Amino acid sequence: MAESFSFDVVSDFDRQELVNTLDQVKREISQRYDLKGTETSVDLDKENIFIITNSELTLNSVNDIIRQKAIKRNLSLKIFDYGEIEMVSGNRVKQTILLKQGIKQDIAKKISKNIRDQIKKINVSINGDTLRVASKSKNDLQFAIKLVSELEESLNIPLKANNFR
């Protein structure tokens, strides 16, 4: 019997790179002349980044810094889901950035259907927030990886193919 090959499709990011990115952002905020004295805070919890500052202009500057530093550290900008800007006490503004991780069930079904429609001799299974793509042909799997990278653009979520076996 022929050997079967597989890979996993995941939507995640390197958390340590995100922590490093936010450390660089905080350092730049403390050093930039236009941001000194703004009492800007950038905090990270399990699923969100919280930015609190004194004006919307400063908030936009901080968001630009976050994007620049994330790109330099090879983090996809698609992991950031920017929330509404809220007014908080003392004429300050707050924004919550949700960190997207994992593939939702409906998106997983779209990816699975698209791959199976394009490649007939392939098996796609949904395991929680990942997809396992298996086939007897390495060429089919390489074509599936190409399809996944094309789907990433249209679905607006970061997708990676890993565990290629």
From Swiss-Prot:
Keyword Nucleotide-binding: yes
GO MF assignments: nucleotide binding
Entry keyword Zinc: no
Top-rank taxon, per record: Bacteria
Gene Ontology CC, one term: cytosol
InterPro entries per the UniProt record, alphabetical: DUF520, UPF0234-like_C, UPF0234_N, YajQ-like_sf
Alphabetical keyword list: Nucleotide-binding
Pfam families in alphabetical order: DUF520
SUPFAM superfamilies noted in UniProt: YajQ-like
Matching PANTHER family: UPF0234 PROTEIN YAJQ
Family: Belongs to the YajQ family.
HAMAP family xrefs: YajQ
Its biological purpose: Nucleotide-binding protein.
Protein name: Nucleotide-binding protein P9215_05621
